[in-house]
Curated annotation (Swiss-Prot):
Species per Swiss-Prot/TrEMBL record: Danio rerio (Zebrafish)
Compositionally biased spans, kind Low complexity: 877-907
Principal location listed in the UniProt entry: nucleus
Protein name, entry field: Chromodomain-helicase-DNA-binding protein 1-like
Activity control, per UniProt: Adopts an inactive conformation in absence of DNA damage. Binding to poly-ADP-ribosylated histones activates the ATP-dependent chromatin remodeler activity.
Chain's role: ATP-dependent chromatin remodeler that mediates chromatin-remodeling following DNA damage. Recruited to DNA damage sites through interaction with poly-ADP-ribose: specifically recognizes and binds histones that are poly-ADP-ribosylated on serine residues in response to DNA damage. Poly-ADP-ribose-binding activates the ATP-dependent chromatin remodeler activity, thereby regulating chromatin during DNA repair. Catalyzes nucleosome sliding away from DNA breaks in an ATP-dependent manner.
Length: 1026
């Protein structure tokens, strides 16, 4: 008997039978839910754990109701044990709102405080709690817990609940160490994957919930005690006895058989000719990695990642997408995967299905989002870049509105996210860890789902995806065995089995068939035959399908029983690549080396080093092919042109019909709401008001008359300098309908209540299309003695679903200025603009100024551009009708002391929104300073870093003039990583051996640099691997 089993028996009494009933829980405040039998058993088990233990792990499979069981435990603690709190619940940001709603719905007698928000809001919450500490549950996120750990440590928590507790699998992590310092009576860990990788992670969870038995320093003893579990079967039962008091796990197949059936299948696709060219080129890029025995694993992993990107979409490589970058069929035709997905989504939409679409790569999500926009599919998106409030809104919209597709990264949002509105899950590409894919699929197939669910995986035939997938199959089967039978050491063997084959051999898989032809292998498929039939938006089950097609009964019976994510056609692809693959690859190597030797003799170096992008031209070996005659070439060209013209015409007709239908619906909606649009009418380019564009050839020199010159003013554009005429103030906004803060947004709000009111109303009524101009008076608070002031809001920017703001679109600005010209002419008004886009990096002020001059000044509209001096109590009224522009004239762009037309540097920019920075920076003078560049020369390669954390750090790094490298190379100066296992340690040692110039540091170094606004010494942050 091991010391661990002895300690468990000495310290943890046997659990008695619980007499707890659901009526008891209802009496103590639980309501609006009927617990299933297994859920009530779970609450009983949790209540018994509270009597004699410091903590426990509720490890039910995803979707079985761990949240409601935990809420029931809190109701029990308050009602039966007379605990009035405080209880602390930690969860991911994406499911925090779900926790709040379910706490209020299932147990309204528990008062809940959501501890979130910015620093000021949290300080206010702390003050309120200090004056009135009467609450039961404090609900917050891991990030807030780490930020305000000192404050949260001051409380004595009766119960601590950690949702998605696999975040604690590393006992050296900051979250694990921080929570250990809290004063806690009982700890509850919730995780659908209590065992993911190895015994160290299991012990990390155990030492967190029961530190008196599982001492932190005894982790090696625990691993050694059960390392030989396969050769000593007696250890299996012993390990079960150690875990049994602390871990409860049920799976859907055992306790939720009433859930609608989940069917899972793999659909293969070919590759386009472009993808095949890049696939071959990637394999040939780093030849030494395949030839030498000393090649590092990192170089091969780089090749592996590039191959995965190639199979997804070739546009993931810079320089591949043809210019100009316009949406078109080329986006679909360039990728075999997207070609198949295109057909599949059309079939699914026609059948009334709703889809979760997963990808590992955020750049692939960008391409998919472009595609969905192009096809006109309704969608929501959620990945690491989406803010918390936007996430909740996206989830709510998908669940309550008729949204066709939810676009997600596999790990985004947390595994507790409920998306049962979907009945179809599509994995564009798979995760190396099969547990992550299972968690993702469980967002749709969980309690609350009323329709059968279909899980579809898209795999590139004869590509790296096949063998990666088959290895995930192998790992998942071993993991299932471990969980069910207790043989935890098999997890380590699963890792070694997956890496037993040389990575260089894995990369050769399928090359014989894949590269036997350079033609596209994309084919049309019968989707009804592959995906199955559906009726009224629901997939038919095997039984229903058999009634429709008795001939398929035998086939359906064969598939039954193999209904899990990683059934792979009964084939074992984990074996070595075929002899044909090896032979084809060797022939490719020989040919490539021969070409390189010839090139070296001629003094040309053709071989690219590892890490170089694939944007350059690729070698495309000539094929022996009968040359076409001139007549045949002409015939082919004409056919292609005719087909392209036909597709374009049909697409244009469909687009026009859809626009007309949408317009009629919008007009009917506006009528029902009593809404009247303030948008200026569209200007007919051939109408009488549009004069010839002779201005395009006019030289803007000092010979311009005062009447046609732009006037440059030092003053406040919200109080235009006009005589007796009407004045139109111009401001650029985005299409989101959310009024900004700071800069011109705040100034306009002080001038009038109308700007925010009319803009947000137009946003609510979907009246903010790009190029629209809202025109309305702003004299409600302040007015001139003579003449009226109007505000023209040009919708010139776009904000996408990920809250990313575009630059000012000159085409939209051009259209808006045309409309303003017509309105100004009718009202005999002058036009007053801020210095649009000033100090915005890459902004085309020259083009903007030409548009203003073209549409306004040279056509007789009195036009003024304002510069605002910050820091002064009031704007200095100073103006001049200059015949030279600040952008092209040296005197006008001089320092404040040299010219009255320049403005002082801005004192504070923190209050400006991004939209304000782009469109209202007229409040910042030409002398505005740029961002700090203290990270210049720093090139960072991130290793084993969470995607959200990496994205955040990269954003700051680039802001301060540093660079992030996707591939390890001699340019890298710092490796920022996290070491969580011996495998990571070995890989990093190999990296540092190959690239000795790089320093291995903790992410805290970057955070310290950003916080102190200087490049700090790395001495305190270096990671020692010896």
């Amino acid at each position: 008997m091991s010391t661990f089993l002895r300690a468990v028996r000495d310290n943890i009494p046997e659990k008695d039978k619980s007499e707890l009933t659901e009526n008891d829980l209802k009496k103590w405040g639980l309501g609006a839910i009927h617990l299933r039998p297994y859920q009530l058993d779970g609450v009983k088990w949790l209540s018994l754990c509270m009597k004699n233990q410091q903590g426990c792990i509720l490890g039910d499979e995803m979707g079985l109701g761990k949240t409601c069981q935990t809420i029931s435990l809190l109701a029990y603690a308050r009602g039966s044990l007379k605990m009035n709190g405080p209880f602390l619940v930690l969860c991911p940001l994406a499911v925090l709102e779900n926790w709040r709603q379910e706490l209020e719905r299932f147990c309204p007698s528990l008062s809940v405080i959501c501890y979130t928000g910015d620093k000021e809001k949290r300080a206010e919450l702390q003050q309120n709690l200090k004056s009135d500490p009467r609450f039961h549950v404090l609900l917050t996120t891991y990030e807030m817990c780490l930020k305000d750990a000192r404050y949260l440590k001051s409380w004595k928590w009766k119960i601590l609940v950690v949702d998605e507790a696999h975040r604690l699998k590393n006992q050296e992590s900051l979250l694990h160490q921080t929570l250990k310092e809290f004063t806690v009576g009982f700890r509850v860990l919730l995780t659908g994957t209590p065992i993911q990788n190895n015994l160290q992670e299991v012990y990390s969870l155990l030492t967190f919930i029961q530190p008196s038995v599982f001492l932190p320093e005894a982790v090696e003893d625990f691993v050694n005690a059960y390392a030989d579990i396969q050769t000593e079967p007696a250890l299996v039962d012993e390990l079960h006895q150690v875990l049994q008091p602390f871990l409860l796990r049920r799976v859907k197949a055992e306790v939720a058989a009433e859930l609608p059936k989940k069917t899972e299948l793999v659909v293969f696709h070919g590759l386009s000719a472009l993808q095949k060219r890049y696939y071959k080129a990637i394999l040939m890029r780093d030849l030494d990695a395949f030839r030498t025995d000393q090649s590092t694993k990192t170089r091969l992993l780089n090749v592996l990642m590039q191959l995965r990107k190639c199979v997804d979409h070739p546009y993931l490589f810079d320089g591949v997408e043809p210019e100009p970058f316009e949406m078109g069929e080329h986006l679909v035709e360039a990728s075999g995967k997207l070609s198949l997905l295109d057909s599949m989504l059309a079939y699914l939409q026609e059948g009334g299905h709703h889809v979760l679409l997963f990808s590992q790569m955020t750049r692939m999500l960008d391409i998919l989002q472009d595609y969905l926009e192009y096809r006109g599919y309704s969608y929501e998106r959620l990945d690491g870049s989406v803010r918390g409030e936007e996430r909740n809104l996206a989830i709510k919209n998908f669940s309550t509105k008729d949204v066709f597709i939810f676009l997600l990264s596999t790990k985004a949002g947390g595994v507790g996210m409920n998306l049962t509105a979907a009945d179809t899950v599509i994995f564009v590409d798979g995760d190396f860890n099969p547990q992550n894919d299972l968690q993702a699929a469980a967002r749709a197939h969980r309690i609350g789902q009323t329709r059968p669910v279909k899980v579809i995986r898209l795999l590139g035939r004869d590509t790296i995806e096949e063998i990666i997938y088959s290895r995930a199959v192998s790992k998942l089967r071993l993991t299932d065995t471990v969980i069910e039978e207790g043989r935890f050491s098999l997890l380590d063997q699963a890792q070694s089995a997956a890496s037993g084959l040389q990575l260089s051999e894995i990369l050769k898989f399928g090359v014989d068939k894949l590269l036997s032809s350079e033609e596209s292998s994309v084919q049309d498929v019968d989707l009804q035959l592959i995906l199955g039939q559906s009726r009224d938006g629901q997939w038919l089950t095997d039984e229903e399908h058999a009634k429709l097609n008795e001939s398929n009964e035998e086939e359906d019976e064969d598939m039954e029983g193999q209904n899990h994510m990683y059934y792979f056609e009964g084939k074992d692809y984990s074996k070595d690549p075929s002899a044909e693959d090896e032979k084809t690859f060797e022939l490719l190597l020989e040919k490539q080396f021969a070409e390189m030797e010839d090139a070296e003799k001629e003094g040309r170096a053709l071989r690219n080093k590892a890490g170089v992008s694939l944007s350059g031209p690729l070698i495309n070996p000539a094929r022996k092919k009968r040359p076409l005659t001139e007549a045949e070439l002409e015939e082919r060209r004409q056919k292609r042109q005719a087909a392209a013209a036909k597709r374009a015409k049909l697409q244009e007709e469909r687009k026009k019909q859809q626009e007309e239908l949408n317009y009629k619906k919008k007009m009917a909606w506006w009528d029902s709401c009593g809404y009247r649009s303030l948008c200026l009418p569209r200007v007919d380019s051939e109408g009488e008001d549009m004069e010839p564009d002779e201005d395009d050839h006019v030289s803007f020199s000092s010979t311009d008359s005062d009447h046609t010159a732009i006037r440059y003013v030092l003053g406040d554009v919200t109080h235009p300098q006009a005589d007796r005429e009407d004045a139109i103030i111009v401001h650029c906004v985005d299409d989101s309908g959310h009024w900004g803060r700071g800069g011109l947004f705040t100034a306009l709000g002080l001038r009038s209540d109308e700007p925010r009111k009319q803009y947000e109303l137009a946003g609510d009524m979907k009246d903010l299309e790009l190029g629209n101009v809202l025109l309305f008076p702003v004299d409600d608070k302040q007015s001139r003695l003579c003449g009226r002031d109007y505000l023209a809001l040009i919708v010139a920017q776009q904000r996408d679903k990920a809250n990313k703001l575009s630059g000012i679109r000159l085409t939209a600005l051009d259209e808006g200025l045309k409309k303003i010209y017509k309105a100004a002419k009718q009202k005999k008004a002058s036009v007053h603009l801020p210095r649009i886009g000033h100090s915005t990096k890459g902004f085309n002020w020259y083009g903007t100024e030409r548009l203003i001059r073209k549409h306004l000044a040279t056509r007789g509209i009195f036009t003024s551009i304002y510069y605002y001096r910050r820091g002064s109590s009031h704007a200095t009224v100073s103006s001049t009708a200059s015949t030279t522009t600040p952008s092209s004239s040296k005197p006008a762009a001089s320092s404040p002391s040299e010219s009255p037309h320049s403005s002082s540097p801005p004192a504070n920019r923190e209050g400006l929104t991004k939209s304000a920075e782009l469109s209202t920076t007229s409040h910042e003078g030409p002398g505005a300073p740029g961002l700090a560049d203290f990270m210049r020369g720093v090139h960072v390669y991130f290793y084993n870093m969470a995607a959200t954390e990496k994205k955040k750090l990269t954003r700051y790094l680039i802001t301060y003039d540093g660079d992030e490298e996707d591939l390890m190379s001699s340019h890298v100066t710092h490796i920022v990583g996290e070491v969580e296992s011996p495998v990571h340690k070995q890989e990093l040692q190999d990296l540092l051996h190959q690239y000795p110039q790089a320093l291995l540091v903790k992410k805290n170094w970057l955070e310290s640099c950003f916080a102190s606004q200087r490049k700090v010494s790395v001495s305190k942050y270096v990671i020692r691997l010896t």
